[in-house]
């Protein structure tokens, strides 16, 4: 029997996923979520984000939550300063990017490519383009192909309204790109492909390194398979209530869903009682 992971009693930093965690299903910040982040600051707990989104798609949240620490975009493919300056990037090789795009084409799955600060698509009316436009706050660049940016791709997303089909492609992509890419569903309809070291576990490690923070005193919260890598290395791993069972099983504790203010409840009930400053004053 595998021994349970130790859960640490002191938390000095919380790193949160965005879509499905910090935001509601309608992609909004609740008043309670904003207040929870403020309470973290008062308690001396650092707060930052790690997301599959591009940096530009996180700018409004960074401003609304007054994030003062480095954060991670593209599942860790980019480390970004709170002023949106790029600290570090890890991009797909041109071979891996080409192979993934060919795979998506063979399965008739829409591809989005993020490169040069833009979101690129070959289809303005493709599945979830309108929804992603609302979430990110900017429009895709419609292009005939991706050849001109193939050597500097930050992320490829396979997009489908057939989740079972996309899950099958996920497994095929992992076999095809083993050692060359990180392949994970960021939700049931989006398959993210990034540099092999661009995952949320590496991102949290890098953020802690930049801050001089202790991983054992770091809490993380998320809802999808791309969050499991950070669950495995943090001192406290929290899964959202609507997360798939396998994701919940990888966490230490489960909060309520993002439709039920699960983020703010996790802060109040799980993180703040472990706040480093509060414990130091006891």
Regions found by a protein language model. Name each.
Residues 26-130:
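Active-site phosphate-binding/coordination module
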Residues 40, 62, 104, 174-176, ...:
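A generic structural signal for well-ordered alpha-helical segments
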Residues 3-13, 29-30, 192-282:
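Mg2+-dependent phosphoryl-transfer enzymes with acidic/Ser/Thr/Gly-rich catalytic loops
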Residues 65-67, 74-75, 177-179, 233-234, ...:
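Short, structured coil segments at secondary-structure junctions
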Residues 107-221, 225-233, 242:
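Conserved acidic, metal-coordinating active-site core of Asp-based
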Residues 17:
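Active-site residues of response regulator receiver
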Residues 33, 58-62, 169, 173, ...:
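Hydrophobic packing residues within well-ordered alpha-helices of enzyme cores
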